[in-house]
Amino acid sequence: MRHRKSGRQLNRSSTHLNSMLKNMACSLFTHEVIKTTLSKAKELRRIVEPIITLSKIDTVSHRRLVFSRIRDNAIVAKLFKKLGPCFFSRLGGYTRILKCGFRSGDKAPMAYIELVDRVKNNKKNEILKK
């Protein structure tokens, strides 16, 4: 029986699931928006939100905790220098999941997961203004 077990299995072993979610979290922090299946996006949100909460206060212990989960110095630096101060006044809900239809091969529901206060690139608008 499956009583009191949280999270999704996503048809993977636990080690594969953990490494996949770490890689997806790194991609989300790097690009600030990624496209994935809806269930993976919902599971990724459970991983990403506590990391952003830790990155709001820049202490050595918080840096070590975040590094133990992410394992990439460049992304940890970006979290504490750029993303943490950006989300300092927000109490939670750092990510947004937007449904974007179904995948053509197997009709799996797809979604974009993005950081809420991300800076959008408006290169087209800058070119049009010139």
UniProtKB/Swiss-Prot annotation:
Ribonucleoprotein found in the keyword field: yes
Chain segments annotated as coiled-coil in the UniProt record: none
A Pfam family it matches: Ribosomal_L17
Keyword Transmembrane helix part of the UniProt annotation: no
Keywords, comma-separated and alphabetical: Ribonucleoprotein, Ribosomal protein
Subunit structure: Part of the 50S ribosomal subunit. Contacts protein L32.
Record-stated family: Belongs to the bacterial ribosomal protein bL17 family.
Protein name: Large ribosomal subunit protein bL17
Organism: Buchnera aphidicola subsp. Acyrthosiphon pisum (strain Tuc7)
Gene name of this polypeptide: rplQ
